[in-house]
Amino acid sequence: LAHKMRTSTVIANENIKKAQEIQSLISTEYYKCEITNDVPGVEFSSAIKNIYSMLIGAAEGLSNPSAPIEIQKKFYLNTSASLIHRSISEMVEFVCYYGGKSETVYGLAGLGDLYVSVIGGRNSMMGKYLGQGYLYKDAKELFMKDITVEGAELAFEIGPKILKDLKAKLIVTTQQVGGQNMNKIAKQQNINDNFIKL
């Protein structure tokens, strides 16, 4: 924002007039603000996207190590696209279950935030290490010791409840990674090295 790079945000308030007031105060030519009264949808979307961005990041780490590096770097994107599709589907189910609106997931708080996190976030970086075969605790100690990884912490906290309430496979898979190798998890879930079966 300091450099006036174009970006957008979403303001959630049950009182839509209040949201409009805030929108008028902070919107600029380069800072666009959308508004919604779907507070739970925005809150849940922005939180759980961290879990999914971690799992999508694992796609790069899980690329077939026997393939040439240039092939790994190019084609894990197809794997990521498949995981993004599955992630958004689960996010819709999750958000609607807890009182949010599906359209919120397809907006800035869901799909938009997920995209940013996957492209350059801390959670996707942790996912890459998990995909390479590191356990979470080892990757945290070796590479991200002083960095907060919200997706991992949230997955550990809500994983069991999600399994009970929704059977959301990707969240549960991510939660299991805490004590197991990602490649082992992939095999248990009948997923091959590039998640093609997803």
Q: Over which residues does each language-model region extend?
A:
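Short glycine-biased active-site loop of nucleotidyltransferases that positions the nucleotide triphosphate
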Residues: L1-A2, S45, V118
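Short, flexible turn/loop "capping" segments at secondary-structure junctions
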Residues: L1-K4, L108
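Internal alpha-helical scaffold of NAD(P)-dependent oxidoreductase catalytic cores
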Residues: M5-T104
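Predominant activation on well-ordered alpha-helical scaffold segments within soluble catalytic domains
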Residues: Q20-S24, Y52-I56, H85-V92, C96, ...
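Short amphipathic alpha-helical surface patches that mediate protein-protein
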Residues: S27, G110, T174-G178
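Conserved beta-strand termini and adjacent loop/short-helix elements that scaffold enzyme active sites
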Residues: T36-D38, L108, T173-Q175
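Small-residue-rich helix-loop
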Residues: L77-Y115, I119-G120, Q132-D146
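C-terminal active-site/capping subdomain that shapes the small-molecule cofactor and substrate pocket
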Residues: G120-L198
